[in-house]
């Protein structure tokens, strides 16, 4: 099955104060860390129209804005846009604000999308993580239906799908991999954590 990697980088980043996708991280930017976790293959970045030029100037070739009718409708619109505008059977999704996610974790999730499953969703500390997940192309019509009804919660969408829920600890994924960097305080703590780890 052909896999397409999807980086969700279309959030408003209001609490962060600047586009999170371009936050500095390990000699690069947050979104580039997501690309490393994919480990290669076709990658599409879903972003806001005003940020596309910056991605292109950083030599990214496949950058899309949400479908016009669903613009500004959150990650559901981003995943739908990727499915509609690219040729793939499975879609591995990473939100750009989770820079600690590893390739090992994403491979483990990808391997579990088999048979008639629509999605593989990790669960960490009793919280579903639908923005670090794998989806089959067949869910596109469900996403469209949810968007047209303005039902934008990912958890509501998952109720309509055949989902394999995977406990993070069962695939050796640490809770830090699912931590969202939403504010500058989160970012400062992240940098301090990494600096401390490097000194150990």
Curated annotation (Swiss-Prot):
Its EC number is 2.7.7.77. One of its GO terms (cellular component) is cytoplasm. GO terms for biological process: Mo-molybdopterin cofactor biosynthetic process. Pfam families: NTP_transf_3. GO terms for molecular function: GTP binding; metal ion binding; molybdenum cofactor guanylyltransferase activity. GTP binds at residues 8-10, 20, 66, 97. It catalyses: Mo-molybdopterin + GTP + H(+) = Mo-molybdopterin guanine dinucleotide + diphosphate. Mg(2+) binds at residue 97. It is an enzyme of class 2 (transferase). It is found in: Cytoplasm. It comes from the Bacteria. Keywords: Cytoplasm, GTP-binding, Magnesium, Metal-binding, Molybdenum cofactor biosynthesis, Nucleotide-binding, Transferase. InterPro entries: MobA-like_NTP_Trfase, Molybde_CF_guanTrfase, Nucleotide-diphossugar_trans. Its cofactor is Mg(2+). Belongs to the MobA family. Transfers a GMP moiety from GTP to Mo-molybdopterin (Mo-MPT) cofactor (Moco or molybdenum cofactor) to form Mo-molybdopterin guanine dinucleotide (Mo-MGD) cofactor. The N-terminal domain determines nucleotide recognition and specific binding, while the C-terminal domain determines the specific binding to the target protein. This is Probable molybdenum cofactor guanylyltransferase. It comes from Bacillus velezensis (strain DSM 23117 / BGSC 10A6 / LMG 26770 / FZB42) (Bacillus amyloliquefaciens subsp. plantarum). The lineage of its organism: Bacteria, Bacillati, Bacillota, Bacilli, Bacillales. The gene is mobA.
